[in-house]
Design a protein with these regions (language model features):
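Conserved alpha-helical positions within TPR/SEL1-like repeat arrays
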Residues: 18, 22, 45-56, 79-90, ...
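Structural marker of alpha-solenoid helical repeat scaffolds
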Residues: 39, 73, 107, 141, ...
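Residue-level recognition of tetratricopeptide repeat
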Residues: 43, 77, 111, 145, ...
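Non-heme Fe(II)/2-oxoglutarate
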Residues: 296-388
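Catalytic core of non-heme Fe(II) oxygenases with the double-stranded beta-helix
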Residues: 359, 366, 373-474, 484-485, ...
Length: 515
């Protein structure tokens, strides 16, 4: 935006100030602007330049004040409202940022970047449908905006609309063929949609553009280890250096039965980092049982002691309105399915259920957060990282429903990207007397981990909980768990979720969106 001088201050002094800003001498521009403002407090240009200088130095809190001072003097400036929105976003004042973008749009309705940035704010606030509308408004103004299509794809994917997300990512790529993040995100969404062959092509396209792309390397590694190509997977994890890459390498070594290399790396990781990886805890526990050695990884050495089950009052009460609404939303809301190879006679939702707009899901999320706090209080005296490093911010890495029918079951697995995992039970089959059909079973073995001595199989203990409707079960994410098959002619419906670890910035999804 062009900057015009004001007669309220000496034109030569103002020009010197503008020259300092335009030449990148931001600290000097800041100093000059403050000195001039002390003498000419009502000169718009001085506050504007000061805001830009502060913004450029990442002094966002101060920049917010300067933008606001400038707007008090001249309020009909859409670019200034837009810049204010960006600065407010940087200091996490999201409601105010959204309002600034709305003001920019009011002043300039075709300001497509403001529509896009408003979408990112709404998405961060979990207002996915509003975010989608905002992105679409921006794209109606400028359909050639590749980044706008990318951001739309991230919101659609979060909202569980995988086909529409795939279309949005493909459009972004058509507009900008070298859009590495779009190729990678397209691959992730195709994977969730069950088209692994096309997903791999997308990862490879991303890596052809940027061989060091962390997410694409991670995703290729994940594909290779699922294909049991462990040595190839390790190389990609090494290149990714992303999130839990060291745990994934340990997994590959263990599944390949390269136990010597596994033990060497486990010891190194245990000595160099805090014991805050549930995934490594799973592997360390299995190795200790397998070889009859002590488990020194202190995430949660006795995970069976940390399984927690209790009813949620709002769901267990007779004729629960919340229970009825949750079941209605699961059965009738437009939520795409995610292909899940471990699930038999059932379906699993795609996207992040607790980010959806339905009030029932949001209410349940808040009730679950209360149970997280109750869990932490119950085990507050425990001397293990599960409790000592319990996340202070209660966020969900993921959330989804699982709906099974007669004969349904889920194979033993863990949630690698969780800290604390759990499920709330909304419908349960009636088991035969003395039977634990449909129960939640947990243990220390699963995923075809190698057992060196068949005589040790009984050392890998299991236990189970038979939940009632309205119950919540919480457990360390390091525990294997499964659903025991049931034969009753009834649905078994639960909503599962993971508490986000404090020590991981993000999952392996690269759904970064911004203008």
């Amino acid at each position: 935006m062009a900057i015009s001088t004001s007669s309220q201050a000496n034109p030569e002094a103002v020009q010197t100030l503008i020259n300092a800003l335009n030449s990148g001498q931001l600290a000097q521009a800041e100093s000059l602007a403050k000195a001039l403002i002390a003498q000419h407090a009502n000169t718009f240009i001085l506050h504007h330049v000061l805001a830009l200088a502060l913004d450029g130095q990442h002094k966002f809190s101060e920049a917010v004040g300067s933008y606001q001072n400038a707007l008090k003097l001249q309020s009909n400036m859409p670019d200034l409202q837009f810049n204010l929105g960006i600065a407010l976003t940087q200091v996490n004042r999201l409601d105010e940022a959204a309002n600034a973008y709305l003001q920019a749009i009011r002043l300039q309705p075709n300001f497509f970047e403001a529509h896009g940035n408003l979408g990112t704010i709404l998405q961060r606030q979990g207002k996915l449908e509003e975010a989608i509308v905002s992105y679409q408004k921006g794209l109606k103004i400028n359909p050639q905006d590749a980044r706008g299509h990318f951001n739309l794809g991230t919101a659609l994917r979060d909202n569980g609309d995988l086909p529409a997300a795939i279309k949005a990512y493909k459009t972004a790529i058509e507009l900008f063929s070298n859009y590495t993040d779009a190729h990678n995100n397209l691959g992730e969404t195709l994977r969730d949609f069950g088209d692994m062959a096309e997903a791999v092509k997308s990862y490879q396209a991303a890596l052809a553009l940027n061989a060091s792309h962390a997410n694409a390397n991670y995703n290729m590694a994940e594909f290779l280890y699922l294909a049991k190509k462990y040595d190839e997977a390790i190389a990609y994890f090494e290149r990714s250096q992303l999130d839990d890459w060291q745990a994934r390498i340990l997994y590959c070594l263990y599944k390949a039965e390269n136990f010597a290399a596994f033990k060497t790396k486990l010891d190194a990781v245990s000595q160099q980092t805090r014991h805050t990886s549930p995934f490594i805890a799973t592997l360390a526990t299995h190795y200790a049982i397998n070889f009859g050695v002590e488990n020194n990884y202190n995430f949660c050495k006795n995970p069976f002691d940390f399984v927690y089950s209790t009813p949620i009052a709002e769901l267990e009460q007779p004729n629960s309105a919340l229970l009825k609404q949750l079941l209605d939303d699961i059965n009738h809301a437009d939520i795409a399915e995610r292909v899940q190879g471990m699930l038999t006679n059932g379906k699993q939702s795609a996207g992040n259920l607790f980010k959806r707009p339905e009030a029932s899901f949001r209410e349940l999320a808040e009730l679950i957060k209360q149970q997280f706090l109750a869990y932490k209080t119950k085990f507050s005296s425990a001397d293990c990282e599960l409790i000592l490093s319990f996340p202070s911010e209660l966020e969900f890495t993921s959330s989804w429903y699982v709906k099974m029918r007669q004969g349904g079951h889920l194979s033993p697995h863990i949630h690698e990207i969780g800290w604390l995992s759990g499920a709330v039970y909304l419908a349960m089959p009636t088991p035969k007397a003395g039977s634990n059909e449909g129960a939640f079973e947990y243990g220390t073995h699963g995923d075809n981990y190698p057992i060196c001595n068949p005589q040790l199989r009984d050392q890998f203990a299991t236990a189970s909980v038979l939940p009632k409707v309205g119950d919540i079960v919480l457990f360390p994410s390091s525990l294997f768990h499964r659903t025991i098959p049931y034969q009753a002619n009834a649905d078994r419906i639960c909503i599962a979720f993971d508490l986000k670890p404090a020590f991981r910035v993000a999952s392996n999804n690269s759904d970064k969106n911004s203008y």
